[in-house]
């Protein structure tokens, strides 16, 4: 029988369509005969083409000039930014009803490797550490700008996930507002704290450690699992075990451990599902609420194995055709 499952962190319902459920191995992607070169002469993110991007905001390099070769991780403004640093934060009305403001913010690209064809699962551990440390450095820098209310770090991998350039990269957006969907998620966590006196994500971790059927990986400080009410097959969360509302609280040592968990999970997915398209997002508290007790930063991975259709678009409720307990076991036990 199909199940309706409720996400304890958002109170949103998901349909687990067991009547049309697929086996985990049915989600393995068909092989695509596309071999990428380690370098492309016309790629703006490849070394030697630094003049094709705006001036860098930061880079980890072993030598060479600023905005030149020699780097292994590099952050630059997005050439086609959704938001720009200049402008006014004053909100204006139009036609006495509509509200608008200048698109002020910061939109950056974190170029994860000088190698054009090297994705995170195939990187050396040290390289993935440097990527996460770059996330941390840019977050800590941008949160000092009083104009910004929220910083979101995300990655689009593959065309179904919305990527437009093959070269491995992530993105960061610092915005002057907190979008309604994030405010909703935050308010639900606040409501749980008011009712129970605990962080709902900390409670989720404790429940996951008791049951363990959806657990994929556990280290000293981090946990990875498939959520009870997964929106899509193989959806994965990575959370710090200790309560931290903001990604900005992550230490250098924790960044390194987190990077190893992230790489391990993505490598399992790469091998088990044949390099699927996916998005990942680091969910974190708004800047002014970074010390609150009711939110808990985490990374969410959403593989793009199915396409949302009219029901999902019309209701906001997702239909998942895979049991999280089965997908977790499949990934957990898959040899890499």
Task: Tell what function each PLM region has.
Residues 1-336:
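HIT superfamily nucleotide-processing domains
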């Amino acid at each position: 029988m199909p199940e309706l499952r409720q996400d304890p962190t958002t109170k949103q319902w998901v349909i687990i369509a067991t009547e049309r459920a697929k086996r985990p191995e049915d989600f393995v992607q068909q092989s695509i005969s596309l071999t990428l070169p380690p370098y492309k002469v016309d790629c703006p993110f490849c070394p030697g083409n630094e003049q094709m991007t705006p001036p860098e905001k930061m880079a980890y390099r072993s030598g060479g000039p600023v905005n030149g070769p020699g780097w292994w991780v590099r952050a630059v403004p997005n050439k086609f930014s959704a938001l720009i640093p200049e402008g006014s934060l004053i909100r204006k009305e139009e036609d006495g009803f509509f509200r608008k403001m200048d698109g002020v913010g910061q939109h950056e690209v974190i170029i994860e490797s000088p190698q054009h064809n090297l994705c995170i699962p195939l990187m050396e551990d040290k390289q993935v550490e440097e990527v996460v440390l770059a996330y941390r450095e840019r977050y800590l820098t941008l949160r000092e700008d009083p104009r910004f209310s929220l910083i979101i770090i995300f990655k689009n991998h593959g065309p179904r996930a919305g990527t437009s350039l093959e070269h491995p990269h992530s993105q960061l957006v610092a915005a002057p507002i907190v979008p309604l969907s994030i405010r909703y998620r935050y308010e639900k966590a606040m409501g749980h704290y008011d009712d129970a006196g605990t962080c709902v994500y900390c409670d989720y971790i404790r429940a996951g450690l008791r049951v363990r059927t959806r657990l994929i990986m556990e280290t000293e400080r981090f946990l990875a699992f498939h959520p009870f009410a997964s929106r899509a097959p193989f959806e994965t969360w990575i959370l710090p075990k200790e309560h931290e509302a903001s990604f900005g609280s992550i230490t250098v040592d924790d960044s390194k451990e987190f990077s190893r968990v992230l790489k391990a999970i993505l490598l399992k997915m790469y091998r088990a599902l044949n390099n699927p398209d996916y998005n990942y997002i680091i969910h974190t508290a708004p800047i002014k609420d970074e010390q609150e007790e009711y939110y808990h930063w985490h990374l969410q991975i959403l593989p793009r194995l199915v396409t949302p259709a009219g029901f999902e678009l019309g209701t906001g409720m997702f239909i998942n055709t895979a049991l999280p307990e089965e997908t977790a076991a499949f990934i957990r036990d898959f040899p890499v």
